[in-house]
Every structure is written in C-alpha cells, then in structure tokens.
Amino acid sequence: MSAPINKEKVEQEAEQQIHKIRITLTSTKVKQLENVSANIIRNAAQYNIVKKGPVRMPTKVLKITTRKTPNGEGSKTWDAYEMRIHKRVIDLQAPASTVKRITQITIEPGVDVEVTIAA
C-alpha cells in the first residue's frame, strides 16, 4: 500500500521549481525606468539568480500634429506633440518565492511593471 500524499510537501516542491520569469518595465521617463531596472538587477544579484537584461527595446514615438488656430482663420500654423515610450525587459530564472522577494521593491510613479511566468 502506498503512503498518503502530503499536500505540504507537494506545495513546497512546486514552489521550489525553477520558473522562467519575464519582467517588462514601461515608462515615459527614462531615469525612473533605469532606477527601477537597476534595483531589480541588484536584488537579483543578492539572491544569486540567473538573469538576462535589462534589454532595451525600441522606443515608441507617438506623434500628434494639430492646427494652432481653432477656427481655420489666419496663417496655417501647426503644433507637433510627441510622447516617447521606453521599454526594458529583464529575464530571470528562479523559484516563484524568490521572485516575490525581488519584486517587492518601491517602484517609482510612472513606471509600469508587468511580470509573466512561464513553466
């Protein structure tokens, strides 16, 4: 007869399993983005985690051109506005519990963080 399966043991094994984690950082402010990515890399180095990055993805430039005058009278002058969106990708290979500790840092306002876990 087989021994009953211990649920705690199964949960611990699943938690210690190494996952591929991708952290995507997006912001319009480069300095804040670099600070957050440096903090994540620094924390990953403390736990001796296999890491790749931060990989700098191409900057998206959103442009809008509008007429200066609201009624169409006068000379045809235009205003051009643009917003630059910067993106960084960091790949980690670690257990999920360790990644929770790494990502519990203070994230500066204006920086969006997306964490995806692959088995």
From Swiss-Prot:
> Which top-level group of life is the source organism from?
Eukaryota
Per the record, the GO terms for biological process are: translation
Q: Which Pfam families does the entry mention?
A: Ribosomal_S10
A Gene Ontology molecular function term for this protein is:
RNA binding
The keyword Mitochondrion appears for this protein: no
| UniProt-listed InterPro entries | Ribosomal_uS10, Ribosomal_uS10_CS, Ribosomal_uS10_dom, Ribosomal_uS10_dom_sf, Ribosomal_uS10_euk/arc
Provide this UniProt record's keywords sorted from A to Z: Cytoplasm, Ribonucleoprotein, Ribosomal protein
Q: Which GO terms describe its cellular component?
A: cytosolic small ribosomal subunit; hyphal cell wall; yeast-form cell wall
Q: Which NCBIfam families match?
A: uS10_euk_arch
Spell out the family assignment given in the record's similarity comment: Belongs to the universal ribosomal protein uS10 family.
PANTHER family, A to Z: 30S RIBOSOMAL PROTEIN S10 FAMILY MEMBER
Q: What does this protein do?
A: Component of the ribosome, a large ribonucleoprotein complex responsible for the synthesis of proteins in the cell. The small ribosomal subunit (SSU) binds messenger RNAs (mRNAs) and translates the encoded message by selecting cognate aminoacyl-transfer RNA (tRNA) molecules. The large subunit (LSU) contains the ribosomal catalytic site termed the peptidyl transferase center (PTC), which catalyzes the formation of peptide bonds, thereby polymerizing the amino acids delivered by tRNAs into a polypeptide chain.
Put simply, this protein is called Small ribosomal subunit protein uS10
| Gene (UniProt) | RPS20
